[in-house]
């Protein structure tokens, strides 16, 4: 059956700031306490969405979360009115305010893991929300992510949205950022490659930085998503590259159809994994980047592999990259050699995503890939699909509500909280989502 990959991109939130919350993510740590520009960040993301939509790649949007997230601050013992909660936490424990204000939901590659209907036992599209257990600020996301996905994929005959796994380290799950799908045409059954960093009882694990994904979680997600067991491979990421800042697999590998584009050192027992894929995926092609040409360190600093590999109608592929790749002489030289070589990648598209990149999120972090048949695509909430009208409406919305300068100290401003809630109330109406945010359900909004 014919199917297409639709990229659902996360819209950057109003509290986008640099706080170094993500140990193991070197860009996040390096840019801690810099001044951010939320308006520019949102516009950089919107421009990527619109440019790809105009080039013929189906594109949709997932909205940001409510931030600062007052309910979690109350859970941590700060009481009073919302304004009093902000004032108290800013004075007594500002690090909690930063965590509760993180715009990290914009990286929707971590929102969920997807199984297309061609791969599932019941013929539905399955989406399992990620618990993001390893980082406090990200562990807050799952409930609202679930509400958003249910409002977007709201036809229960075609879509099953599953709640996140229990919030324990043993079941740490980081979503699609540790998941690849390989195969022929999108509508044909594919092989799902689940990538984990550690498993119980196995001493092969990183020592410097945390392995956020467990094998136990990957196995549970495959079960929840009802993936045909014949179509699943579990593979361990190389712990050495996790210790060099590769905190998700999408920082060291990206797949599309029959192609796996990855670093030579991406996986533990890599030659064995590639042989397995070669035997199970027709026409499988591994494009392994040698360490001698691009080091792991350069891959992390440029986000070469946190790229999008997109298929054109003629079977050729386009690699969507952050500007940092073009600015690195060695990486750009490699990419031009790649274009000249015998492989499906025939063009490069570069975007300026500096605001997101400074927090450790490139093009692939910002998108959730969902393979849909024509019938399934028609069942998606149409208001989230990117087109001229939505692009203009969202740009105007960003201009109206977003600040162009934000520091950690600004997070305590009650006006920022009010601006954010008003903005999200307007956005839920624009995207026809209903009341998906806690503040709306408590009567604070009219969505």
Curated annotation (Swiss-Prot):
Binding residues for substrate: 19-28, 110, 137-138, 212, 250, 359
One GO BP: arginine catabolic process to glutamate
Pfam family, one: AstB
Keywords attached to this entry: Arginine metabolism, Hydrolase
Reaction equations catalysed: N(2)-succinyl-L-arginine + 2 H2O + 2 H(+) = N(2)-succinyl-L-ornithine + 2 NH4(+) + CO2
Name of the protein in question: N-succinylarginine dihydrolase
Active-site residues from the entry: 174, 248, 365 (nucleophile)
Family the UniProt entry places it in: Belongs to the succinylarginine dihydrolase family.
Superkingdom of origin organism: Bacteria
PANTHER family (UniProt xref): N-SUCCINYLARGININE DIHYDROLASE
Gene3D superfamilies: Succinylarginine dihydrolase
Organism, scientific name: Escherichia coli O6:K15:H31 (strain 536 / UPEC)
Oligomer and partners: Homodimer.
């Amino acid at each position: 059956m014919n199917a297409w990959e639709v990229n659902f991109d996360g819209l950057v939130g109003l509290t986008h700031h640099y706080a170094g919350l993500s140990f193991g993510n070197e860009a996040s740590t390096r840019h801690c306490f810099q001044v951010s520009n939320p308006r520019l960040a949102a516009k950089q993301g919107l421009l990527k969405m619109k440019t790809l939509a105009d080039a013929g790649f189906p594109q949709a949007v997932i909205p940001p979360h409510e931030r600062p997230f007052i309910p979690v601050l109350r859970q941590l013992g700060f009481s009073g009115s919302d304004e009093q909660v902000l004032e108290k936490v800013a004075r007594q424990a500002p690090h909690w305010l930063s965590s509760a204000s993180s715009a990290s939901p914009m990286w929707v590659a971590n929102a969920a893991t997807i199984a297309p209907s061609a791969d599932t036992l019941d013929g539905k599209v399955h989406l399992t929300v990620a618990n993001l257990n390893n980082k406090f600020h990200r562990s807050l996301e799952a409930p609202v992510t679930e509400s958003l996905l249910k409002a977007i994929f709201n036809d229960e005959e075609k879509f099953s949205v599953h709640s996140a796994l229990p919030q324990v380290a043993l079941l740490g799950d980081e979503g699609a950022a540790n998941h690849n799908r390989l195969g022929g045409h999108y509508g044909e059954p594919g092989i799902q490659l689940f990538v984990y960093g550690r498993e119980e009882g196995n001493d092969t694990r990183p020592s410097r930085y945390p392995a956020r994904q467990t094998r136990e979680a990957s196995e549970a997600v495959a079960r929840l998503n009802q993936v045909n067991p014949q179509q699943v491979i579990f593979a361990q990421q190389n712990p050495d590259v996790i210790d060099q800042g590769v905190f998700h697999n999408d920082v060291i590998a990206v797949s599309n159809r029959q192609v796996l584009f990855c670093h030579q050192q991406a996986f533990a027992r890599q030659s064995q994994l590639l042989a397995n894929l070669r035997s199970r995926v027709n026409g499988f092609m591994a494009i392994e980047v040698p360490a001698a040409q691009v080091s792991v360190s350069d891959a992390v600093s440029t986000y070469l592999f946190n790229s999008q590999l997109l298929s054109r109608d003629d079977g050729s592929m386009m690699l969507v990259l952050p500007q940092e790749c073009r600015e690195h002489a060695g990486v750009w030289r490699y990419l031009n050699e790649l274009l000249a070589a015998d492989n499906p990648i025939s063009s490069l598209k570069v975007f300026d995503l500096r605001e997101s990149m400074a927090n450790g999120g490139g093009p692939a972090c910002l998108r959730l890939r969902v393979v849909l048949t024509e019938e399934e695509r028609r069942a998606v909430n149409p208001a989230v699909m990117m087109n001229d009208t939505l692009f203009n409406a969202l740009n105007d919305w960003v201009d109206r509500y977003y600040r162009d300068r934000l520091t950690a100290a600004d997070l305590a401003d009650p006006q920022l909280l009010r601006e954010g809630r008003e903005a999200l109330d307007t956005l839920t109406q624009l995207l026809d989502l209903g009341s998906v945010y806690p503040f709306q359900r408590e009567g604070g909004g009219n969505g």
